[in-house]
């Protein structure tokens, strides 16, 4: 579960979130809605621990309080975020990136097993053959980087307590929506929590039963 109490957040002198509170139980998906500028993406980034955001209040998951932890420790505690615009990383290829994730997150498996698994994930999400050797830099499109990040989410499912999805379908083809739905359902089946921000009407309707409207928060 994740419990957020009296969470406020600002970037520089601009306060974006003010005393937000909610709880998401294991196996639930929370749809976060609100007008542009209401802080939907900022809420996810605050939970993830983006360093330029100043936050106060409480963010608790099963492993404890997160509010004072840096981003990498929140990741190790079981929080994963799929970004609306995943950053490019110079000087590293995709396979090296996954090896680093395996090391940091202490995921079991040999290098050959990791290569086999990641290749199958890349095929599943629709990335081109040989993707594991591609540089993870500006040569990769935004859609390709987003697909790559979604495969990371699948790879880390067993360790993820809280999955943060910021416009996961943005910039992707229509066929990717079902894969996002599958990812959300599998996370819920494993008693993880999902926080979803999306402008996709079908996804909004599908997950509208449990909703936080920041326009009325």
Predicted features, each with a name:
Residues 48-49:
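Helix-to-loop junction immediately C-terminal to a conserved catalytic motif
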Residues 2, 17-19:
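Conserved structural motif at the start of ABC-family nucleotide-binding domains
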Residues 58-74, 137:
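ABC ATPase NBD Q-loop/coupling interface
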Residues 33-35:
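The feature captures the beta-strand-to-loop junction immediately N-terminal to the Walker
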Residues 85, 91-105:
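Q-loop/switch helix immediately C-terminal to the Walker
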Residues 167-168:
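Walker B catalytic motif
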Residues 197-199:
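H-loop/switch region of ABC-family ATPase nucleotide-binding domains
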Residues 143-164:
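GG-anchored amphipathic helix commonly corresponding to the ABC/SMC/Rad50 NBD signature/C-loop
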